[in-house]
Amino acid sequence: MANSSIFYKDNESDYESSTVGPDSSRRTSWLSSSFTASPSCSSISHLSNHGLNSYNQSKPHKANQVAWEAMARLRRCCGRAVGLEHFRLLKRLGSGDIGSVYLCQIRGSPETAFYAMKVVDKEAVAVKKKLGRAEMEKKILGMLDHPFCPTLYAAFEASHYSFLVMEYCPGGDLYAVRLRQPSKRFTISSTRFYAAETLVALEYLHMMGIVYRDLKPENVLIREDGHVMLSDFDLSFKCDVVPQFLSDNDRDRGHQEDDDDISIRRKCSTPSCTTTPLNPVISCFSPTSSRRRKKNVVTTTIHENAAGTSDSVKSNDVSRTFSRSPSSCSRVSNGLRDISGGCPSIFAEPINARSKSFVGTHEYLAPEVISGQGHGSAVDWWTYGIFLYEMIFGRTPFKGDNNEKTLVNILKAPLTFPKVIVNSPKEYEDMVNAQDLIIKLLVKNPKKRLGSLKGSIEIKRHEFFEGVNWALIRSIKPPWVPKEETSHKTKGDNRSVNYYLPPRFMMSRKERNEPYHVSNYFDYF
């Protein structure tokens, strides 16, 4: 049972703040070892045929970026063999389980483009038996071309180190942004924006046959334009996936169909199987508009029954009743059209992919991962529910005094919500919708979890996302834009500043043209 308490209060302060730092994390530090390497381009750099094909291919979403153009110019100058000697490292941005990430620039480049360079000590991760994870991340990054996924600009090796040059996100991660809100949580409107873009990114990954398995605010980064980018794919795995066309008649079948009735078939021999990646086309249909019927808001409390579905039970605290348009193909709210209602669309969900790996952050682990009975793409929808909960309420729902108690809570504890104060009927309704979505995502039985059969298309249709124009989601102004903050702070400065970066890390022309020097210790910051 999910308990909920929402109260009205006038003049409650907003949660949002435009102050944010570029890095904050709950992770432990990772220390790299020393290495020696020749400064020559031919000896320090190594690119496999797969790397050349994957990382140098045309990526339409990045073709006009300054960082992409600068990297293309570098490849032309050095004969495509990009190596460590071509970059100047400025500072460490953070560290993870298999590597550290550094801010860097191309030496001698006229552009002020910044990159994030992930450095993996292959010997260290081999000892920890995690080398396969590093290789899988490299392979997956080479496949991606999406506005909300990272771009892999270059990949090379030096000594026993592996280097991945990726997009730099100056806004930091959502965990850091959340901590800088007055109440350490986001408003519903901000949560809806970040959750919608994250959902589109997960949809793309699933259409590519990639199960992410590591969604959390620390892994959702903020680009300079305020839009999101997923990061850290070392826990992901790949499998075959075949997109299917979902008609209006199929959408009402919901979770009543059995596994044998599912029209999609996937296959994956191992968690890290290598298959030909799918180049998906995410459908953005433009149906004729129709008016949605007005909602009548009453008081109710949301409860979750034993079967894992949600019921609305009358109460004096929180409730709602809805009048729905039975055949509407789109819903209009505040000038924004929700085109996911009853329209034919393409979906691809790797529901038959299976892994028994115990991976992830404890507070975000799905019950099926903890039980060790095998898990598939439904784990991403569980973590998505935890992600929503933390964004709105400032904490995760099952956190215990230690990791062991946290795991027990995930398996056995009921879902509950803290008391929340709202100021208006609109906020009241939004909070009820948010809690209802979280309840349907945090169903312990993965087969009954929202999204387990038809993926993101089920989640997009939920009332929480009503009014979101999925086809034009990149046109919506984000709650916070690092680029605008930079322009304000550097007003009157003649320098061209493209990224949110402290002035002490900006390279002068002399520094950019300094001769390359290999340090005895890579981790010299």
Curated annotation (Swiss-Prot):
It holds the Pfam family Pkinase. It catalyses: L-seryl-[protein] + ATP = O-phospho-L-seryl-[protein] + ADP + H(+); L-threonyl-[protein] + ATP = O-phospho-L-threonyl-[protein] + ADP + H(+). SMART domains: S_TKc (SM00220). Residues 87-465 form the Protein kinase domain. Keywords: ATP-binding, Auxin signaling pathway, Developmental protein, Kinase, Nucleotide-binding, Phosphoprotein, Serine/threonine-protein kinase, Transferase. The active site is at D214 (proton acceptor). Signal peptide: none annotated. Disruption phenotype: No visible phenotype under normal growth conditions. Residues 466-525 form the AGC-kinase C-terminal domain. GO terms for molecular function: ATP binding; kinase activity; protein serine kinase activity; protein serine/threonine kinase activity. Disulfide bonds: none annotated. Belongs to the protein kinase superfamily. Ser/Thr protein kinase family. Serine/threonine-protein kinase involved in the regulation of auxin signaling. Plays a minor role in the regulation of cellular auxin efflux and cotyledon organogenesis. This is Protein kinase PINOID 2.
